Structure formats: structure tokens, C-alpha cells
């Protein structure tokens, strides 16, 4: 009997020691080590790839933002604020009442096929809107000028980047809306165009948030 109790106590004590050791290693030491390495070597990425303006965090370089006008009475979908560069559309994501700046809870693409009537209508309507919104008194946009990313959402619906072609398409409208010359606005786009990663991965791109921060500074100094 005594041996049975002793063996049981020994096993319980061994199990408790294992629990304590594993708790310290996996619950304290390992997280601290990973956090230390992340902060030491990849501080920017570990903190969410934050973008700051005037000393304040205004967003992440990994998540797109919407630049829309306030909803008017009776409207279900806000109109784009044409003073700012616009990102890719987010068709099919819907809306949520928890986070209105980013549709994070509803991220994802639609499941509609390429020949779906609703999707075809979305693309046609989006192209017509891009042509209308970006045509100015002295610069007319043709449907053939509209790049694919201007009328299609990304896989997540939260793409922070647009193609240089789509950014270039918006230059004349941005200049007109903000009472700027075209040349400095085009220069902003050129300065914020990133090439392919490592020279061969992906496509050239423009981060919309970073571009709009630079645009805000340009407007303030003009």
C-alpha cells in the first residue's frame, strides 16, 4: 500500500515538474526569444509595417484604405473622394459595423466565375466610373486606358498597392481636384513607384497610402 502511494506521489511530482518546466519554456522563454529576434531583426514587420505621418501611425503598408466621401442620406455605397488617389475596388466584401475604415472582418474575394453576369456588370460599371471620374476638361480617358486593377478587386480585397498605370491614370484628376499642376503630381507617382521585388518577383506597384500622404504634403506646401 505504502509503495503504491509513494509511486503515485512520485509520478504526480514528475508530471508537475514537467508541466512547470514546459510552461516556463514554451509559455515564457520561447515567446520572449521569438519577440526579441523579431524586434531585433524585423522590427518594422513585427509591429505591423506601420506607416507614420506627422509622428502618428496612420495605417499599415500591407492594408489598403478607402478614400470615400461621407454617406449621403439614402446612399448605400459611399462615393470616392476624388481629391485622393483611389485603390482597387473591393466588390463583394459588403460592409460591417465593427470596423468602417478597413473591411478586415470581410476580407476575401468573391466566388463568382469569370462569366458571371453580376461580375461582368460590376466590371463594366467600374470601368465606366473610372473613365468618368478621371476625365478632366483637358484630358479624356478612354476605356482602353483603364488597367485591370482599376476594375477588379484583389484576392483579399485589401490590396494596399495599385499598378503604376492606374496611378498614372489618376494624375490629371488629382491635379484638377487639388488645383495643382500635372507635373508635380506625376513626379509624386514616379517617386512612389516600387519595382519588382529582387528585380524579378511580382510587378511594379504604388502604395496608395504612402502616395496620398505625399500628396497631402504637396497640397499643403502649394
Curated annotation (Swiss-Prot):
A single cellular component GO annotation: plasma membrane
Xref: InterPro entries: KdpC (IPR003820)
Localization annotation: Cell membrane
UniProt topology in membrane: Single-pass membrane protein
Family annotation (NCBIfam families): kdpC, PRK13994.1
Family: Belongs to the KdpC family.
Oligomer status and interactors: The system is composed of three essential subunits: KdpA, KdpB and KdpC.
Native organism taxonomy: Bacteria, Bacillati, Actinomycetota, Actinomycetes, Kitasatosporales
Pfam families in alphabetical order: KdpC
PANTHER family according to UniProt: POTASSIUM-TRANSPORTING ATPASE C CHAIN, POTASSIUM-TRANSPORTING ATPASE KDPC SUBUNIT
Keyword tRNA processing attributed: no
Key words of the record: ATP-binding, Cell membrane, Ion transport, Membrane, Nucleotide-binding, Potassium, Potassium transport, Transmembrane, Transmembrane helix, Transport
Protein name per the record: Potassium-transporting ATPase KdpC subunit
Transmembrane segments: 13-35
Record keyword Cell membrane present: yes
GO molecular function: ATP binding; P-type potassium transmembrane transporter activity
Job of this protein: Part of the high-affinity ATP-driven potassium transport (or Kdp) system, which catalyzes the hydrolysis of ATP coupled with the electrogenic transport of potassium into the cytoplasm. This subunit acts as a catalytic chaperone that increases the ATP-binding affinity of the ATP-hydrolyzing subunit KdpB by the formation of a transient KdpB/KdpC/ATP ternary complex.
Segments of this protein annotated with the region Disordered: 136-162
Amino acid at each position: 500500500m505504502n509503495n503504491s502511494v509513494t509511486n503515485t506521489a512520485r509520478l504526480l511530482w514528475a508530471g508537475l515538474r514537467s508541466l512547470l518546466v514546459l510552461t516556463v519554456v514554451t509559455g515564457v522563454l520561447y515567446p520572449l526569444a521569438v519577440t526579441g529576434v523579431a524586434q531585433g531583426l524585423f522590427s518594422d514587420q513585427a509591429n505591423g509595417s506601420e506607416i507614420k505621418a506627422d509622428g502618428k501611425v496612420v495605417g499599415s503598408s500591407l492594408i489598403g484604405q478607402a478614400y470615400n466621401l461621407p454617406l449621403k442620406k439614402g446612399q448605400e455605397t459611399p462615393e470616392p473622394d476624388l481629391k485622393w488617389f483611389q485603390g482597387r475596388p473591393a466588390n463583394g466584401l459588403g460592409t460591417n459595423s465593427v470596423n468602417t475604415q478597413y473591411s478586415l472582418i470581410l476580407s476575401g474575394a468573391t466566388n463568382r466565375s469569370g462569366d458571371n453576369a453580376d461580375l461582368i456588370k460590376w466590371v463594366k460599371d467600374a470601368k465606366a466610373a473610372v473613365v468618368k471620374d478621371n476625365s478632366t476638361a483637358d484630358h479624356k480617358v478612354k476605356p482602353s486606358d483603364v488597367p485591370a486593377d482599376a476594375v477588379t478587386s484583389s484576392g483579399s480585397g485589401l490590396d494596399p498597392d495599385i499598378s503604376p498605370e492606374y496611378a498614372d491614370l489618376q494624375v490629371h484628376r488629382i491635379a484638377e481636384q487639388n488645383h495643382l499642376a500635372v507635373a508635380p503630381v506625376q513626379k509624386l507617382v514616379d517617386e512612389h513607384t516600387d519595382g519588382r521585388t529582387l528585380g524579378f518577383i511580382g510587378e511594379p506597384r504604388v502604395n496608395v497610402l504612402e502616395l496620398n500622404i505625399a500628396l497631402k504634403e504637396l497640397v499643403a506646401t502649394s
